[in-house]
């Protein structure tokens, strides 16, 4: 070791080494420098920007002329590269470089660009790259910000762009566009000087291209005097120029169809028209009569964008002209007939334009109102085309919002159809249906839209709610939904509102649905600042007060649906109850009841009969629940045989849930959350009866599920009215096709036997069935044929009616089933509230089996509709997440402990009898939940007792036995475990029992004998593997170890070792996949047992396992070599040697390594690894590597000579080492180890020859060469690869570490070597193979 450490000091660097180090540093910088240009051309924008920043930073920190010249040359070359996507990247990098280094002359750069990509000397192949290189070069000069300051470079650039504009096939209008961008930033004096050179005085040339027109407009804007002196007085909007302007705008629209933006030339023309007071002429002649005469979608969208962009520029009169012209009608028609994908593109753009306009005139409410009214009045046969929910309303100030609501209200009351910008589509015009053009239909469509727009103003999330506006809308909706005016009175402003068209039932029905939508908005959207007005009362309470006031003014107002005396008494009683609840408003329960009472009270105007009964029941329940002594009231209810108030309330909530109202659903959840602490078993049974699959399938429910058919028919009629009439023909065709298909399906069905019999009888009665012998009979007469036809017609008519009745019955049943499933999903809300808010309620335990029945039935159901899936998912989520995994659970289970144990047994048995393992998992988890309930109460008492009295473990176990019957539970789970380990197909799984064992180690302790019995018993291999797996997972658990005393634990480990040893007798004889899995499992179990023995230092006799394993070594080795079960044989072999290592037997080296290190007499000199690559010819083999009869001493001496010779440059083929691969030979040929360090072979210090043991294997020349090179690179003397056995492993690991640690520059040693290699060999592919050389260097660092 001393001899190895002595050469670690590096020798003084020679002058040649110092020069090479400098060149190495320069080369490293060059690599980093050159990598920037590769990253600049990458498609990722962040990578490009990062590379450009690093390049600029590199050039700033290293001001080197050669690198700056190379950078400019490389960037200029990149302007015309073949990859078109990379050209803008190089242009941007060049612009930033010129911006950072202002001392670089722009004219020189421009000259270099024109020299590199000469337009005069370019051939056909280089034409396109050269043109783009010059264009991007000029753009780079302009983007640097220095071009407008350098007059000479500017003139050259303008001239170059003018030349490039002569190649429109490649560059299109990009040169003129670049020229316009440049001239828009130059000073006015320079613009006047450049203008004559770029703009000719011919208007035909200007009106030929949008870019030239844009240049003309720019000149007219900046230097109008110079332009007039150059071209004279020009009227751009003359009659002669109108067609040219239209064509130019069409070309401009097509040029930006992919960018989806407004062309600049269109907006410039608009500004010029406004400046010259020619806006009306431009709008009508150019846009409406020109572009929209035969519009394409590009021209139409350009006009729409121009409309939006012009809004902030127009006056009040001009806005009226624009918003009531042909263009706005074309916009509305496009909104109606466009496909959804196109509609979704234009609506956000128009919304952005309108939002910008409204935001810009916040201080002008009149202008905001004009814009909102203008877009509202764009109608298609009375229906506005804009959506009712429009986000731009958030920009309205309070005054404009108030005025807009007033305008909507007035338009609803007295629709002014003449003020609308109405239109009809082409299909609507062709239909010529008189019923579609009547004013009543247009009024209905307009009023329906206005109602939803009013509600959306309140519903909008981003709108700052003004209480006056909210109250105005709410009062308007409530009054006209449920009341009518008899006589106007100043006390009720709504009575002064008169209708020019009577309010029909359809509009009133829309009003009713919109009113309850408004209630939901006021209840949900304002929850952050609860739905309270300034006086602290909810909006629903204020609306109820308003309704009560209207009912009291029966001389002036009457309700649409007249209330009977009983219904009016129910209303008055509700108002008195509300006052009582208001006095107790501090209680959350009172608030919930108040909310329910208000909502049901408002429903009395919609359905008086039903709401009246519900109101009475609710008030009775509220009064009973608010009594001071609820126990006394319950006993009084029992004595009088009346239902408990909470039961009545649950029935009411279930009936309210049957209504398809989300608002009612939320209110029911809220109210039930307050009454669930008072639930009785009868209440729970009412809810579970709704969920029971058997009850729902076999019996009619007590709760009638309503679907509000009238409302749905109304909504359906509204949808039909809102749809486009041009789709009616296609819909009728589809209906006829569907009818034909259904008739064909009916005919294809199996014929009813009864109908077949009737048909045969009719035919026999008419003598239409002739036998074989009746061929000569005469044909039927006309009267007989007519009678037969009538009989057949009546028979088929009856059959058709029967089929139709069956179909109607089937549809009815499907509809009822759908309503029932929807009702069950809603009823699950109550279960979810109960489980989440009252997890410790004793009634929770009664939910397990009903929920399991729902899950089981839903998973077995064949018709897996969406509702079935929703019901299953919601039930499973409540069961698993809210029930089984709840942190809190019931603690009062003492009286029902016996029933709970029976339920555990029943659940486990049901889990084992399921056909689906996924269903069995739910049953098994339910049993685990019950175990936790039983065990949790025990633990709680045990902890209290432990704290107070310091009871020992045995006493606590006795106490546990009194509460949790461990023997009973053990028998139950033992039977299920036996079922798992004996049945061929069992629904139980291993993870189920692993979960049981991890949660309840005491039960696991009792079940261990069952597992041990099946490890070595006459079980199936798969069952033995399962038993081994469960044992392996559980024995390593710390919780299980605590349950055992030390002698008991040692006895268990000894017993399991004996079982495992007995099973090991069959190791290596696997013939099937199950047997092979058993072998893996038993070895994993054995490793776990041995690890436990070693870790806890148990006194266990390991002789038997060792003997069995040693006897199986040869068989396993043969199995591995033969490749039997190749997917797991290596794993099996590794597990085997892990066990042997824990038994004290080290794993020998593999035969592959031995054959490589110690070649036998019969083996080829080439290693097994190199044999796979091919054999060497005899002439290439190294002589005397190992001859026959060679002694170990001679072999070692010959290899020592080989080490010495390896330090000298190889000259002849006979001295070459054996083949080590193509790449290795190339590296050796390029540079020998002695040349790497800059010294000759004579200067290389001779290695020492330590004493060699005869039994020491010699290293192969490949390993020797790796060792030698690594040591020479670091300046150390190469160590002989022949070492004693005791030092070999330590030497291999230590050689690299010590040399690198003692080297003066440990991290730079290998890069220096790589650089010196490159400098010596002068490889031209240095930069391209950087990654390859880094990989080679990393391999050289590794220890051989």
UniProtKB/Swiss-Prot annotation:
Residues 732-747 have a biased composition (Acidic residues). One of its GO terms (cellular component) is nucleus. Residues 1-24, 710-751, 1146-1344 are annotated as: Disordered. GO terms for biological process: cellular response to glucose starvation; chromatin remodeling; circadian regulation of gene expression; intrinsic apoptotic signaling pathway by p53 class mediator; negative regulation of DNA-templated transcription; positive regulation of anoikis; positive regulation of transcription by RNA polymerase I; positive regulation of transcription by RNA polymerase II. Residues 7-19, 1317-1329 have a biased composition (Low complexity). The modification N-acetylalanine is found at residue 2. There is a cross-link at residue 1149 (Glycyl lysine isopeptide (Lys-Gly) (interchain with G-Cter in SUMO2)). One of its GO terms (molecular function) is zinc ion binding. It holds the Pfam family DNA_pol_phi. The modification Citrulline is found at residue 1322. The modification Phosphothreonine is found at residues 1191, 1251, 1256, 1277. The modification N6-acetyllysine is found at residues 69, 156. May activate or repress transcription via interactions with sequence specific DNA-binding proteins. Repression may be mediated at least in part by histone deacetylase activity (HDAC activity). Acts as a corepressor and in concert with CRY1, represses the transcription of the core circadian clock component PER2. Preferentially binds to dimethylated histone H3 'Lys-9' (H3K9me2) on the PER2 promoter. Has a role in rRNA biogenesis together with PWP1. Component of the B-WICH complex, at least composed of SMARCA5/SNF2H, BAZ1B/WSTF, SF3B1, DEK, MYO1C, ERCC6, MYBBP1A and DDX21. Binds to and represses JUN and MYB via the leucine zipper regions present in these proteins. Also binds to and represses PPARGC1A: this interaction is abrogated when PPARGC1A is phosphorylated by MAPK1/ERK. Binds to and stimulates transcription by AHR. Binds to KPNA2. Interacts with CLOCK and CRY1. This is Myb-binding protein 1A. It comes from Mus musculus. The lineage of its organism: Eukaryota, Metazoa, Chordata, Craniata, Vertebrata.
């Amino acid at each position: 070791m001393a001899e190895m450490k002595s050469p670690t000091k590096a020798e003084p660097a020679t002058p040649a080494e110092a020069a090479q180090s400098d060149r190495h540093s320069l080369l490293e910088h060059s690599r980093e420098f050159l990598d920037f240009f590769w990253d600049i051309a990458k498609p990722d924008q962040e990578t490009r920007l990062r590379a450009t920043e690093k390049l600029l930073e590199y050039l700033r920190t290293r001001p080197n002329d050669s690198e700056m010249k190379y950078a400019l040359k490389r960037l200029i070359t990149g302007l015309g590269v073949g990859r078109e996507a990379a050209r803008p990247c190089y242009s941007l990098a060049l612009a930033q470089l010129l911006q950072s280094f202002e001392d670089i002359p722009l004219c020189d750069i421009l000259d270099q660009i024109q020299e590199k990509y000469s337009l005069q000397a370019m051939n056909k192949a280089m034409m396109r790259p050269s043109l783009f290189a010059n264009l991007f070069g000029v753009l780079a000069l302009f983007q640097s910000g220095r071009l407008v300051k350098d007059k000479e470079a500017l003139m050259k650039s303008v001239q170059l762009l003018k030349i490039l504009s002569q190649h429109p096939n490649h560059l299109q209008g990009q040169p003129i566009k670049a020229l316009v961008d440049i001239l828009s930033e130059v000073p006015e004096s320079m613009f006047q000087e450049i203008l004559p050179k770029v703009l000719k005085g011919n208007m035909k040339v200007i009106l030929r291209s949008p870019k030239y027109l844009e240049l003309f407009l720019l000149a007219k804007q900046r230097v109008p005097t110079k332009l007039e002196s150059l071209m004279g007085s020009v009227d751009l909007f003359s009659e002669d120029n109108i067609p040219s302007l239209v064509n130019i705008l069409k070309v401009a629209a097509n040029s930006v169809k992919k960018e989806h933006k407004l062309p600049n030339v269109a907006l410039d023309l608009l500004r010029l028209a406004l400046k010259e007071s020619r806006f009306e002429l431009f709008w009508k002649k150019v846009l409406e009569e020109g572009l929209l005469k035969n519009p394409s979608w590009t021209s139409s969208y350009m006009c729409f964008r121009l409309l939006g962009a012009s809004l902030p520029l127009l006056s009040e009169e001009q806005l009226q002209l624009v918003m009531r012209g042909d263009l706005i009608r074309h916009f509305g028609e496009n909104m109606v007939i466009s496909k959804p994908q196109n509609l979704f593109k234009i609506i956000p753009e128009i919304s952005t334009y309108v939002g910008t306009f409204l935001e810009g005139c916040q201080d002008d409410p009149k202008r905001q109102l004009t814009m909102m009214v203008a877009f509202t009045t764009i109608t298609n046969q009375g229906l506005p085309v804009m959506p009712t929910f429009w986000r731009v309303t958030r920009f309205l100030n309070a005054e404009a919002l108030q005025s807009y609501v007033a305008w909507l209200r007035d338009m609803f009351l007295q629709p002014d159809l003449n003020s609308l910008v109405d239109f009809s589509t082409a299909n609507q015009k062709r239909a010529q249906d008189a019923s579609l053009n009547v004013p009543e239909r247009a009024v209905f469509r307009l009023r329906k839209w206005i109602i939803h727009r009013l509600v959306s103003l309140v519903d909008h999330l981003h709108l700052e709610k003004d209480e006056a506006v909210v109250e105005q809308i709410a009062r308007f909706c409530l009054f006209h939904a449920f009341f009518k005016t008899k006589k106007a009175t100043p006390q009720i402003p709504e009575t002064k509102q008169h209708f020019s068209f009577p309010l029909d039932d359809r509009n009133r029905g829309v009003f009713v649905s919109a009113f309850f939508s408004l209630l939901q908005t006021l209840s949900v959207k304002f929850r952050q600042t609860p739905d309270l007005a300034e006086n602290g009362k909810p909006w629903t309470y204020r609306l109820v007060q308003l309704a009560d006031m209207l009912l009291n003014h029966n001389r002036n107002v009457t309700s649409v649906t007249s209330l009977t005396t009983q219904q009016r008494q129910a209303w008055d009683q509700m108002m008195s109850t509300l006052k009582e609840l208001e006095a107790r408003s501090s209680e959350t329960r009172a608030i919930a009841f108040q909310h329910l009472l208000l909502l049901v009270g408002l429903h009395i105007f919609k359905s008086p009969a039903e709401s009246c009964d519900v109101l009475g029941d609710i008030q009775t329940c509220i009064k009973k629940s608010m009594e001071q002594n609820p126990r006394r009231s319950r006993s009084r209810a029992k004595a009088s045989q009346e239902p408990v108030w909470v039961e009545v309330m649950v029935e009411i909530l279930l009936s309210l849930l049957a209504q398809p109202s989300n608002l009612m659903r939320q209110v029911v959840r809220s109210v039930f959350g307050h009454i669930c602490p008072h639930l009785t078993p009868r209440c729970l049974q009412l809810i579970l009866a709704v969920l029971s699959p058997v009850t729902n399938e076999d019996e009619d429910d007590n709760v009638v599920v309503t679907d509000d058919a009238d409302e749905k028919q109304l909504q359906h009629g509204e949808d039909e009215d809102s749809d486009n009439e041009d789709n009616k023909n296609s819909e009728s065709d589809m209906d006829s096709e569907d009818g034909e298909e259904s008739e064909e399906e009916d005919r294809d069905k199996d014929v009813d036997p009864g109908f077949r019999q009737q048909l045969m009888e009719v035919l026999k009665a008419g003598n239409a069935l002739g036998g074989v012998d009746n061929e000569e009979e005469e044909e039927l007469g006309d009267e007989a044929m007519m009678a037969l036809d009538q009989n057949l017609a009546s028979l088929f008519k009856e059959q058709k009616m029967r089929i139709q009745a069956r179909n109607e019955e089937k549809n009815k049943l499907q509809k009822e089933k759908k309503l029932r499933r929807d009702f069950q999903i809603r009823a699950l809300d109550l279960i979810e509230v109960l489980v989440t808010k009252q997890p410790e309620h004793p009634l929770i335990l009664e939910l397990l089996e009903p929920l399991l029945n729902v899950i089981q039935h839903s998973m077995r159901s064949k018709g897996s509709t969406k509702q079935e899936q929703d019901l299953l998912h919601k039930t499973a989520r409540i069961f698993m997440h809210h029930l089984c995994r709840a942190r809190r659970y019931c603690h009062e289970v003492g009286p029902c402990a016996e029933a709970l144990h029976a339920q555990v047994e029943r659940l486990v048995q049901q889990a084992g009898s399921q056909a689906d393992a996924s269903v069995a998992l739910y049953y098994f988890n339910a049993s685990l939940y019950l175990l936790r309930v039983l065990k949790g109460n025990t633990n709680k008492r045990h902890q209290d007792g432990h704290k107070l009295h310091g009871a020992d473990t045995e006493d606590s176990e006795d106490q546990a036995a009194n509460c949790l019957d461990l023997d009973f539970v053990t028998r139950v789970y033992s039977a299920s475990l036996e079922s798992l380990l004996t049945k061929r197909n069992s629904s139980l799984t291993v993870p189920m029992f692993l979960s049981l064992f991890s949660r309840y180690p005491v039960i696991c302790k009792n079940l261990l004998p069952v597992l041990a019995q099946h490890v070595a018993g006459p079980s199936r291999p798969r069952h033995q593997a399962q038993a081994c797996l469960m044992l392996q997972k559980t024995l390593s658990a710390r919780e299980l170890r605590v349950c055992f005393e030390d002698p008991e634990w040692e006895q268990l480990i000894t017993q399991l070792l004996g079982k495992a040893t007995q099973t090991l007798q069959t190791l290596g004889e696997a013939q099937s996949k199950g047997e092979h899995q058993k072998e893996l499992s038993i070895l994993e179990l054995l490793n776990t047992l041995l690890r436990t023995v070693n870790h806890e230092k148990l006194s266990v006799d390991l002789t038997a396992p060792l003997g069995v394993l040693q006897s199986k070594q040869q068989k396993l080795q043969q199995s591995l070599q033969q490749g039997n079960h190749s997917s797991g044989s290596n794993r099996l072999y590794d597990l085997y040697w892990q066990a042997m290592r824990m038994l004290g037997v080290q794993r020998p080296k593999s035969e592959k390594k031995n054959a490589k290190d110690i070649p036998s007499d019969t083996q080829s000199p080439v290693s097994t690894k190199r044999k796979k690559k091919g054999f060497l010819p005899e002439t290439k083999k190294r002589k005397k590597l190992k001859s026959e009869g060679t002694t170990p001493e001679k072999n070692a001496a010959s290899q020592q000579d080989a080490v010495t010779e390896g330090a000298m440059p190889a000259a002849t083929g006979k001295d070459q080492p054996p083949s080590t691969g193509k790449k290795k030979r190339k590296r050796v040929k390029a540079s020998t180890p002695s040349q790497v360090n800059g010294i000759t072979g004579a200067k290389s210090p001779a290695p020492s020859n330590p004493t060699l043991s005869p039994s020491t294997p010699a290293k192969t020349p490949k390993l020797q060469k790796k060792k030698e090179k690594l040591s020479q690179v670091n300046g150390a003397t190469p160590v002989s690869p022949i070492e004693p056995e005791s030092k070999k492993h330590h030497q291999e690991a230590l050689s690299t570490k010590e040399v690198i640690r003692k080297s003066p520059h440990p991290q730079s040693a290998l890069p220096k070597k790589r650089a010196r290699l490159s400098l010596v060999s002068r490889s031209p592919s240095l930069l391209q193979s950087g990654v390859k050389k880094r990989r080679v260097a990393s391999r050289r660092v590794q220890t051989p």
